[in-house]
A protein has these predicted regions:
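N-terminal leader segment of winged-helix/HTH proteins
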Residues: 12, 16, 20, 24, ...
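Charged, amphipathic alpha-helical coiled-coil/dimerization segments
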Residues: 182-237, 351-409
């Protein structure tokens, strides 16, 4: 779904402005209006070329011809009176290419120490902080695992729902939802008339849901500190765009996983997408964490399938190998801090990678004194992992213009900062309770 605000002069298409109004300086808006006019068979703005020349310079004529070819070709292929939602999304991809041509090119590898931007890793790090602080906070009321709590919240917010709808909304498979439903039934927090009937909260579930919801609202206010309502709404709009593409990635990987093994291994990390998605996943805009969890869930599920298909490694094994390969050799303390997991889980995974001949170590005996680096085969898989991660992140963020992407990441950085502060406070409270 396209949620683009009406650009300057955009009211003209609705008959609310005259065609003689001056064209705004936003070249993307100018080209969007030009494409919409071509689709609708309306006169194009004669000032468009001049406005584009002021901002795009020598690329102005090329940009007009590219957009005209796209708009007229899409109209012939579709035949509808009004452009469909995917028309605007694909046009944004075309404009992103023009914008990239305007930017100064970077040659050579990224500077030393600069990690490639991979949104899955960024999401995981932030959500881990939110989850840990949430476990500490909600456990003081009643301990529930995160998925159980999310289902409780959803039933409290939306009323009775069948498990399939819950599974789609929270972004986890039906088997996990079934296990969670079983636990909540045993706790008598939810009920249903028969196996396929909608789930609903019991009186105890309503009471607990109300108490936990008050805590969730307080935590949400903390996580959205210094984020205005307008900024938050744009953040949610962007998440909806990203979620549509994350679901498309997941559907691609599911199809590949069900195909012949030879065909699976020969497929690229990301295939072309025709812009058509299945049922739209409706996000919960009442709290900032829920949409991020759903986005992360779909992106992680497709990532697990992709990395398994391309490397034979689990998602976490690929993560560990990636961290070891970024700036080898890596000492143990640095590795554990980057992974943000406990020593035992990190140790088991590193040991497994060493047994498979993908990681080697140097230094004194003992895990804590070692320095780890990828073997020759590990280095090859490291490149595969990073190229797949780069392509997946590029695919996910492709519909976003440079300024929209910058605003999204700036808001995301505020959430990261607030999540860190929230976790520090909850850890301090837990320490006081223990003493």
């Amino acid at each position: 779904m396209e949620n683009r605000p009406v650009p300057p002069g955009g009211a003209k298409q609705a008959g609310k402005a005259s065609g003689r109004e001056p064209v705004g300086t936003d070249w993307r808006a100018v080209l969007h209006r030009h494409a919409d006019a071509l689709w609708g068979g309306e006169p194009t703005d004669p000032e468009a070329a001049a406005a584009l020349a002021r901002t795009l310079g020598p690329l102005a004529d090329d940009a007009l011809h590219i957009v005209e070819a796209y708009a007229l070709g899409a109209k012939r292929a579709n035949g509808a009176a009004a452009p469909p939602a995917e028309f605007g999304v694909r046009l944004d991809l075309v404009l992103n290419g023009i914008e990239a041509a305007l930017a100064p090119s970077e040659s050579g590898p990224p500077p030393a120490g600069r990690r490639p931007h991979m949104i899955q890793s960024e999401l995981w790090q932030v959500l881990r902080k939110v989850r840990e602080s949430g476990e500490l906070s909600y456990a003081r009321e009643q301990y529930l695992i995160e998925l159980d709590r999310r289902i409780l919240f959803r039933l409290y917010d939306r009323g009775p729902q069948v498990p399939a709808d819950v599974s789609s909304a929270v972004g986890v498979d039906k088997a996990q939802v079934s296990r969670s439903v079983k636990r909540l039934l045993e706790l008598r927090l939810i009920e249903r008339e028969q196996i396929r009937a909608p789930l609903r909260l019991t009186r105890d579930g309503e009471r607990l849901g109300k108490r936990l919801m008050r805590m969730a609202d307080l935590r949400n206010r903390e996580l959205t500190l210094d984020i205005s309502d307008a900024e938050l709404n744009e953040f949610f709009d962007t998440i909806e765009v990203l979620l549509e593409r994350a679901v498309a990635l997941y559907e691609q990987e599911r199809e590949l996983a069900q195909g012949p093994e030879g065909a699976r291994n020969g497929e690229p990390p990301v295939k072309d997408w025709d812009g058509k998605a299945g049922d739209k996943v409706v996000i919960d805009r009442s709290r900032i964490v829920a949409p991020l969890l759903t986005l992360s869930a779909y992106f992680s599920r497709s990532g697990s399938l992709a990395f398994k298909r391309l490397t034979g490694l689990s998602s976490f094994e690929a993560f560990v190998l990636s961290e070891i390969g970024i700036d080898p050799p890596t000492d143990w303390a640095t590795l554990v801090k980057a992974l943000a997991r406990d020593h035992s889980q990190a140790g088991r995974t590193v040991t497994a990678l060493m047994k498979r001949g993908l990681v080697e170590r140097e230094g004194k005996p003992g895990r804590r004194h070692g320095r780890f680096f990828p073997s020759e085969e590990g280095a090859r898989l490291f490149e595969v992992i990073h190229e797949a991660g780069r392509q997946r992140s590029t695919f996910l963020l492709a519909p976003l213009a440079a300024d929209q992407r910058a605003r999204f990441l700036a808001t995301f950085e505020k959430v990261r900062r607030n999540a860190t502060s929230q976790l520090d406070r909850e850890r301090a409270i837990a320490e006081i309770d223990r003493s």
